[in-house]
A protein has these predicted regions:
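Broad, structure-driven detector of short, well-ordered beta-strand segments within folded domains
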Residues: 34, 175-179, 278
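Short alpha-helical segments enriched in small residues
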Residues: 56-261, 312
Length: 312
């Protein structure tokens, strides 16, 4: 009896073209079943392998998954159904770190991704101790000396404001999003006690993509992982490298929504229409749909007993 095993790697950072190039190489090396899905910059790479028994199928599936992990390196953030938001939240909880946003637009981007997840209030203040507090918000400003030294530098200004947010709140990380301005592409930035890291963004990205970029930048900073080509690191108030979108990222196209469950016939009720959408199929034979995954349940209300620290 043939046994089939499926493993799903979750990836964030490369473009669709870069991911596709890697998968074509893996396919040409003999991987029997590959499926690529994408949503708001997150990729799900499905490896499906069949063998005469379960042990062999698991061995072959693990082999190809390990090959893919080696190819994508620090771009792999999880396996299975774990989203980038959940993976970053888990890392913050594990390391007992606190995150704040410098302003309401940035807080909204992060809050929309983190709020549905249990225990998110233990690591993110949702503005209550930062931009939504009138007294503290007035203190989260760009230092005057930084403005004088780098007049008109939007990146330095964002870093200075993030540094002020750290000092005002006592948090470990402060995040900022800046839309496009004259002479500067849109970017996201994360600041901690060591300095700042910023990532340039392609134009016309949706809010979820931008929020994911902040979370990925934070994830890489938390674990000391390699940054993407569109990122720079610097100390606020000191000279910095030029922040531009990498050549590969400029060709990034629009995203396609997906969930890890099989497509169902469309209905008029959006709540009962699956949004599984294959982006590319790398199988040589007829494509085989991945097994059905249950619809994720609505997350429960935050646990008041969850471990947390108080912002100052």
């Amino acid at each position: 009896m043939v046994n089939t095993q499926l493993k799903i790697l979750r990836v964030f950072g490369p473009t669709g073209a870069e991911v596709s190039s890697v998968l074509r190489g893996i396919r040409d090396d003999g991987c029997p079943g590959l499926r690529l899905l994408e949503r708001d910059g997150e990729f799900a790479i499905c490896v499906q392998v069949s063998a005469p028994n379960r042990a062999m199928a698991e061995q072959y599936c693990d082999k190809w998954a390990a090959r893919l992990r080696a190819k994508f390196g620090d771009d792999v953030f999880a396996e299975g159904e774990t989203s980038l938001a959940q993976a970053t939240l888990d890392a913050l909880l594990e390391k007992r770190k606190l995150l704040v946003a410098v302003d309401e637009p940035t807080g909204r981007l992060l809050g929309s991704l983190l709020q549905p997840l249990p225990h998110s209030e233990a690591v993110f203040d949702f503005g209550t101790e930062s931009y939504a507090d009138p007294q503290k918000s007035r203190r989260i400003t760009v230092p005057e000396q930084l403005l004088r030294r780098f007049p008109g530098d939007i990146v330095q200004a964002a870093a200075g404001r993030a540094l002020a947010a750290l000092q005002v709140t006592g948090a470990d990380y402060a995040a900022a999003y800046m839309p496009a301005s004259v002479g500067q592409c849109p970017f996201v930035l994360v600041c901690d006690r060591r300095g700042a890291v910023a990532c340039a963004l392609p134009p016309d990205m949706n809010d979820t993509f931008i929020g994911n970029q902040i979370l990925d930048l934070l994830r890489r900073r938390l674990f000391g992982l390699q940054l993407t080509d569109s990122c720079i690191t610097f100390r606020p108030g000191h000279d910095r490298p030029l922040l531009v979108v990498s050549e590969a990222a400029r060709s990034r196209g629009n995203t396609v929504r997906f969930s890890l469950r099989r497509r169902t016939p469309p209905t008029r009720d959006a709540d009962h229409t699956a949004d599984f959408e294959p982006m590319l199929d790398f199988d040589r034979p007829a494509p085989v749909s991945p097994p059905s995954f249950p619809q994720p349940e609505q997350s429960a209300a935050p646990d008041p007993a969850a471990p947390h620290r108080t912002l100052h």
